[in-house]
């Protein structure tokens, strides 16, 4: 994919995936990091922008890997614990990235790529609305190979 679409840009490669779209409203300060929580390994990319109050996080993409992420329900429950929220969030609706089933809400989309591998995308609504969040998610694809 050479073109990120109108008003967007490419997000690069992250732990075996290509981020094919980053909304124009997302800041240019980009940081990658890796961590582990409750036997799940995260490789993350964060986009920020400077404001008068300091740095503001606009977009986060996390690639999660762990045996406990066997199903979409496992991923949903894991993320609920990680983000300290209700696993039965009524704002989440079903959606798909290719053949992979996921859930999407106003500012977060996540899906199970394969057993043990999930993606979690969180967008600041001031930088990317729910439609752009869905576009970001749809543009995160495994690298060929």
Segments predicted by a language model, with ranges:
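Surface-exposed amphipathic alpha-helical segments
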Residues: 120-145
